[in-house]
Structure formats: structure tokens, C-alpha cells
């Protein structure tokens, strides 16, 4: 095809007359037309060659702009902080664990849950978003500052925001880490704690009244489901701690377990010497004290309780009581019953017996104290040796004291109680003690059944 030189209409290559305007095309015109077509084609090719590079360059620029914005959406400091903020706001513990974990400290989902709760309660979501974005902006604009902290209402550091190199040579790579503190427990008794930490089962053994670390934790309000084992059994419950109640480097842990403490009350035991009472709970024995709480014991098992104590050196036992699980409380009072009539009958008998030889014991102490003081003043052990039971510790220590010429004075005791068991006499009285104070003293004497031939076996204050 070619063009008519007059009207520009289309003509076949061999056609000599234009079908549109009737113009006769000569060979000369044909040659001109061919040259014109070639020139137009050449001009078009030159234009095309000039336009294509610009088009490619424009396309590359557009592509780079698109790539930049895509990278910015996912890798800019603002985008990085948005991932953190969204994880906290949406309770996405898995994502938050990934963001906060470092090579030296793995954050599990339990910690992430506690962290989210703490941020929302102690920082506030709006404040958290504002503070994180402010720290990001300041770090971006600073050439020297490398890190900053987001804090809770009480001033506790909860998040460290820091620069950590660059991403794609363009954006600051931001690092988000949560500071850690050591959680410590101080049990009242030896205990072993088992709980989940770092997605693994952890076991911590703690000694009675000693501070023991259970691990390092990021800021949070924690409630760890825990099994505790003690000599009294196994307990289910929680270990609780909150960074609001933390120290500089540690957090005190409180315990909340299904524990029952037993408080024993005695009935029919007015004549029992309370200092001699022993309380038996299951297979363990404890010293008795009024209002004393004994335990803890698991609320999941029945508990058997009994007691025994002395009246006039004779041991009496209470009836045994079983406390069912349904009746076990945090503080469970248990009343133990002694046979009051039996005890009173025995006490009356012993007091009558005591009165029968009280004069003999009183006379013995009058002679003994005089002899003891004379022996010390004259440094002559023979003056008192006949009043002492030979080869006893008391005999040897008295002999040593007399021979040392140590100043000494012993006062005759005012007898308050005499208890006879076989040929042994237990005497309690009030006298001047070695420290110069007036108070209770105890003697153990040995003699025959009628309180004759008495000898001192033991003395204590």
C-alpha cells in the first residue's frame, strides 16, 4: 500500500490513478512517495528509539517507588513498632513472644500473657502507643542516641527500644526487648515447686526460710499454675508476683495453694503441763502452743490429730480425731479431749503422796545448801560430796567448781512441787539463780521410797 500525494488516500502499489480523487500518479511521483514513506518510517524509528529508554527508565522508577513503599510498610521503624503495638492490643501472645525474644532470653506465651496484662493495666494502651511512637521518632532523628525506655505509671521500665543496624541499607532496624528481674520465693518450710517456664516443665527446690530464685521474668502480672511438694504432701495452686511490687533487681513471690493449717485446742487438760504436750498430726509430732497453727496440709486428704502430755510426770493421751476433707479450711480448729477425771484422780493421789515427804525434802535442801556454801568458802569438796550422787555430771562439775575457788552462793529453794516416780524425786522451787536473778530452779534427787538417803543427781535453771 502507498499514499496518494494529493489527497493522502490509500493506493495499491501498482495503481497509477487515485480511486479517491482521480489524481494520476506518475513514476516520478511514485519515487517521491516511496522516499517519503521511507523517511517517515526512519523518523518514526528514531523517535521510537529515543522514547523506549525513557519509558524503561520511567517504569524502573515507578517499580522502585512501589518496592520502596512495600519495604517501608513492613520494614520501617514505624512499621516495626506497629507489629509490636498490634500484638499487645490484640492479645497476640505468639507474635509478641517472637518480637520480645532474644538470643539470651526466650519469652514464652505465659510471659507474653502476663506482659500484655501488665501493659494494659499499668501503662494503658493509649499511653503505650504514644510512648513507643515517641521513642521511635526520637531515635530516628538522633545520630547519637541508641536506646530509650518505655515506663509504667510507677516508673518501672517495661520496654527497651533500641537501634540494631539497618534493614536494606535504608531503614533503622529497631529492637524491642523487655527488661527482666529475678522472682524469689522464701518458703516457711522446705518445698519443691513445679511449674511451666519457657514452654518447659521447671522444678525449683527451696529451703525453709531461705530466699530462692525461681527464674527471670519480663514485666508482668503473673499467676503460675504450680504443684508444690512438702513433707506433708502435695498441693495444687499458684505462684503470684507483680512487677508493681518489685525491688531493684528482684520480685517477691507470694503463694496461693489449697492448704489447711491445724489449730489445736485442748479439753480436759487443765492439770496437764502444757510445756510437755506433743501434738501428732498424721505421722508427724509437733510441740504444742496455744493458738499455734500447724501445717500446712493438703485439703485433698483426711487428717488425723491427737496429743499427749504429762501431769505429775505421767503421760496422758487424748482421743484421736479425724478431720474429713469437707471440713478442712485455711485455718481448721481441732479440739482434742483428755480424760479429765482420770488425770485429776492421778494428780490428787500424787499431791497426797507429795505432802507425806515434803518435810524430809525441805530438810534435805536446808542441809544441802549449807554444805554447798561451806564447801565453796573453804574449797573443801568433801563437805558437800555426801549430798551428791557419785559419777554424775553434776557431781563432777560441782567438784571442779569447788576446787577452782570460784565465788559462789546457793540459796535454799522455796519448794513449789515434788513429784515422786519410783526412787526419783523431781523438785521444782523458787531460788536465787547463778545469774543473780530470782526464778524457777529444778532438782532431780534420788533416794529410797520414803525420801530417805537423798542425793542430788541433776540441777537446772
Swiss-Prot record:
This is Membrane-associated protein TcaA. Belongs to the TcaA family. It comes from Staphylococcus saprophyticus subsp. saprophyticus (strain ATCC 15305 / DSM 20229 / NCIMB 8711 / NCTC 7292 / S-41). InterPro entries: Mem_prot_TcaA, TcaA_2nd, TcaA_4th. Residues 72-461 are extracellular. One of its GO terms (cellular component) is plasma membrane. It is found in: Cell membrane. A zinc finger (C4-type) spans 4-21. The chain crosses the membrane at residues 51-71. GO terms for biological process: response to antibiotic. It comes from the Bacteria. One of its GO terms (molecular function) is zinc ion binding. Keywords: Antibiotic resistance, Cell membrane, Membrane, Metal-binding, Transmembrane, Transmembrane helix, Zinc, Zinc-finger. Its main location: membrane. It is a single-pass membrane protein. Plays a major role in decreasing resistance to glycopeptide antibiotics. The keyword Cell membrane applies. Residues 1-50 are cytoplasmic.
Amino acid at each position: 500500500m502507498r499514499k496518494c500525494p494529493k489527497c493522502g488516500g490509500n493506493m495499491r502499489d501498482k495503481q497509477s490513478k487515485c480511486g479517491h480523487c482521480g489524481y494520476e500518479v506518475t513514476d516520478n511521483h511514485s519515487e517521491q512517495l516511496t522516499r517519503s514513506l521511507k523517511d517517515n518510517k526512519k523518523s518514526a524509528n528514531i523517535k521510537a528509539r529515543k522514547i523506549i529508554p525513557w519509558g524503561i527508565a520511567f517504569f524502573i522508577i515507578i517499580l522502585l517507588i512501589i518496592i520502596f513503599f512495600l519495604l517501608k510498610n513492613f520494614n520501617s521503624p514505624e512499621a516495626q513498632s506497629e507489629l509490636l503495638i498490634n500484638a499487645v492490643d490484640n492479645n497476640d501472645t505468639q507474635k509478641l513472644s517472637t518480637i520480645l525474644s532474644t538470643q539470651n532470653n526466650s519469652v514464652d506465651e505465659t510471659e507474653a500473657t502476663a506482659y500484655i496484662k501488665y501493659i494494659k493495666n499499668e501503662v494503658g494502651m493509649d499511653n503505650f502507643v504514644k510512648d513507643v511512637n515517641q521513642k521511635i521518632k526520637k531515635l530516628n532523628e538522633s545520630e547519637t542516641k541508641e536506646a530509650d525506655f518505655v515506663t509504667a505509671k510507677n516508673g518501672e521500665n517495661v520496654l527497651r527500644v533500641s537501634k540494631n543496624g539497618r534493614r536494606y541499607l535504608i531503614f533503622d532496624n529497631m529492637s524491642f526487648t523487655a527488661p527482666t528481674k529475678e522472682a524469689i520465693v522464701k518458703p516457711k518450710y522446705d518445698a519443691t515447686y513445679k511449674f511451666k517456664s519457657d514452654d518447659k516443665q521447671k522444678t525449683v527446690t527451696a529451703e525453709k526460710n531461705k530466699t530462692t530464685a525461681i527464674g527471670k521474668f519480663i514485666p508482668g502480672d503473673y499467676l503460675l499454675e504450680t504443684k508444690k511438694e512438702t513433707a506433708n504432701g502435695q498441693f495444687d495452686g499458684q505462684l503470684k508476683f507483680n512487677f508493681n511490687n518489685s525491688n531493684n533487681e528482684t520480685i517477691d513471690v507470694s503463694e496461693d495453694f489449697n492448704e489447711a493449717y491445724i489449730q489445736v485446742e485442748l479439753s480436759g487438760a487443765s492439770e496437764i503441763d502444757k510445756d510437755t504436750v506433743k501434738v501428732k498430726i498424721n505421722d508427724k509430732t509437733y510441740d504444742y502452743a496455744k493458738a499455734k497453727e500447724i501445717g500446712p496440709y493438703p485439703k485433698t486428704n483426711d487428717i488425723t490429730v491427737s496429743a499427749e502430755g504429762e501431769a505429775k510426770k505421767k503421760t496422758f493421751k487424748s482421743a484421736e480425731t479425724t478431720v474429713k476433707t469437707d471440713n478442712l479450711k485455711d485455718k481448721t480448729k481441732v479440739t482434742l479431749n483428755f480424760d479429765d477425771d482420770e488425770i485429776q484422780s492421778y494428780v490428787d493421789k500424787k499431791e497426797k503422796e507429795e505432802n507425806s515427804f515434803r518435810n524430809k525434802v525441805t530438810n534435805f535442801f536446808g542441809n544441802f545448801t549449807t554444805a554447798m556454801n561451806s564447801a565453796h568458802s573453804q574449797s573443801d569438796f568433801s563437805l558437800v560430796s555426801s549430798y551428791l550422787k557419785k559419777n554424775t555430771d553434776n557431781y563432777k562439775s560441782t567438784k571442779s567448781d569447788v576446787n577452782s575457788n570460784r565465788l559462789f552462793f546457793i540459796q535454799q529453794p522455796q519448794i513449789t512441787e515434788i513429784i515422786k516416780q519410783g526412787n526419783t524425786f523431781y523438785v521444782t522451787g523458787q531460788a536465787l539463780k547463778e545469774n543473780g536473778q530470782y526464778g524457777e530452779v529444778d532438782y532431780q534427787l534420788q533416794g529410797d521410797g520414803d525420801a530417805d538417803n537423798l542425793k542430788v543427781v541433776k540441777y537446772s535453771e
